[in-house]
């Protein structure tokens, strides 16, 4: 008899848990929240957030530690739950930002990214995993957030923000967080936020440094007030080119989340007219005051000339992508493909292979027959490296019995720096060094890894 009672009580407890789970799912559906976010591939109109006026017992338990803060309290938590935030970019900044906004109980999160998860993302983009490689980043992030806090409405967008869709999308959210990694998108997001009167919380991270500020908020400047003219494309470095220590975008993304939550809960914003700069090497923060909104600004000034979105790729002279840009500095005759170079190796044709990558990249991988002279050394004409080049060319000329100019092939990671090196070497040929014919290996070592040697490391 006792065993029967224990068994029945156990079954009853299990059924009660099932009923509680079903009630929770029903509540989510009634609030317009689905367990598995549906991926959006175009911008559609969203239904208004169901406004909360109080906290239930689960809310009080979940957010109890931040409810105890006098700066937030119940009023602030309710305000957070009634706010929607659009995160532009689900990468190194967007992942920690979205994670902490969801954990704090933001009402709706729009997650926008047109890219898919790659292995090289995982050291810094902490919402993605090995199992989500190949998935759209927006969907991967939304699913991770839904597992963490199912009460947050996640709307993943697998699309590229453009002049055609930005206004329609941004006007459906209360706050925008720019986590993008390219200049055209920054101008696009800024202008759309100004035209829709949305505050813009912007951050960036590169190498071991980060920056944070808030644009278009309570009379503060917009991005164009500070940067009316975009930088030359060749001066812009991104994570693919310059690298980044994973924890740095993590720090900046968390600070971004803090500013969003302060705006959402009605607290004073710290960086509406300040720029926070983080030096990860020294572990130091410093803040500098920014100039105020500019009367002559073309988008937020007294007489704006930009009243609709532009062609930002044309304006900036670069593509709206965080992928490495491809330079086209040489003629077709000055370049060879990796297949052509493989043929040169197979035929044992005498030549010099010059690797112009920085030493830190050469330490990762290299072709065994290459001579390493960094591009920077060629640009600065460092005597020790010019001497090294002269000796290598001289040795090869002796092997050829001085019958023809030495063939020099230049390689780098992607075929950009190698083109610059070819131009420098052609100017040196016959003057600072003996005559040579110089050609670039198109696509660089990453093309070699993809098309010739599948075991060669990619980075």
Curated annotation (Swiss-Prot):
Coiled coil: none annotated. ATP binds at residues 92, 113, 120-124, 137, 181-182. PROSITE patterns: RHODANESE_3. InterPro entries: MOCS3/Uba4, Rhodanese-like_dom, Rhodanese-like_dom_sf, ThiF/MoeB/HesA, ThiF_NAD_FAD-bd, Ubiquitin-activating_enz. CDD domains: RHOD_ThiF, ThiF_MoeB_HesA_family. One of its GO terms (biological process) is tRNA wobble position uridine thiolation. Its cofactor is Zn(2+). The active site is at residues 239, 412. Its EC number is 2.7.7.80, 2.8.1.11. GO terms for molecular function: ATP binding; metal ion binding; molybdopterin-synthase adenylyltransferase activity; molybdopterin-synthase sulfurtransferase activity; nucleotidyltransferase activity; sulfurtransferase activity; thiosulfate-cyanide sulfurtransferase activity; URM1 activating enzyme activity. Plays a central role in 2-thiolation of mcm(5)S(2)U at tRNA wobble positions of cytosolic tRNA(Lys), tRNA(Glu) and tRNA(Gln). Also essential during biosynthesis of the molybdenum cofactor. Acts by mediating the C-terminal thiocarboxylation of sulfur carriers urm1 and mocs2a. Its N-terminus first activates urm1 and mocs2a as acyl-adenylates (-COAMP), then the persulfide sulfur on the catalytic cysteine is transferred to urm1 and mocs2a to form thiocarboxylation (-COSH) of their C-terminus. This is Adenylyltransferase and sulfurtransferase MOCS3. It comes from Danio rerio.
